[in-house]
Amino acid sequence: MTKICDFDDKMNYIGDYSSTGYARLAKSLIDIVKEQQAKLGYRKEIVRLYYPLSTLRHFFECAGDDNKIAAGMISEQQMLEILAPNNLPKQLTDTIGEIKITAKNERFCIEIPPEGSEYVHENTADNEFISELIALVGTHGCTMEQITELFYKYSDDIEKKDMQNGEFDCYIRFLNEPDDTYYYCFHDEGCHIIYHRFLPQDYADFGF
């Protein structure tokens, strides 16, 4: 496969790295690791995260035309090539480390080394909102009113909508927070409230 992206001989991306699929992937990985560390605490250990091919396609096909690595629908094999060790930019490996990728039936396992977990713990700012949300939904008697108030604590510009798909009751999202574009989907299970968050493109794919 021919790459359109340009790298120097040290694998530094010499274009606008921040608009590449690699940067989008790195942000997603860091977001999830931070969420896990807020839930479970920090350990310097391997973390394995799983992505469907459709999500990885969004990362790389949503970049500007000059930064696309492959045109059209990226296949599983093409994605494995994109994420091969010799194709990973130094900007990515300097943060979350030398990730390892495997795939089966369009489901990708991304293995982050212990150094990546350590980097997230020591070099990224705590996500106070996520920490508070996790603590809130973990308390007995938590209500959607309390959750909504928490969102308003961090922004006056949010959107909350009911969902009628049988899986979630509603979603809330920040409208003008470029670092947090997730749809936070909530379901009241009676004894407690659970949530899952989705990137906008994935939320659209699910057709909720």
Feature-to-residue mapping (PLM):
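Charged low-complexity interaction tracts in eukaryotic proteins
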Residues: D8-T20, P85-T124, F168-C170, F174-E177, ...
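A cross-family detector of function-defining hotspots
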Residues: T143, E149-Y184
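Short glycine-rich, basic-tinged beta-strand/loop micro-motifs
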Residues: G41-G64, F129-V137
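Intrinsically disordered, low-complexity regulatory segments enriched in Ser/Thr/Pro
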Residues: P178-F208
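N-terminal trafficking/processing presequences and adjacent post-cleavage segments
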Residues: K3-C5, D126-M144
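Charge-enriched amphipathic alpha-helical scaffolds
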Residues: V47, R57-E98
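Amphipathic alpha-helical segments
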Residues: S75-Q77, E81-A84, H140-D156
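Short alpha-helical segments that sit at the start of domains
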Residues: C5-L40, A125-D126
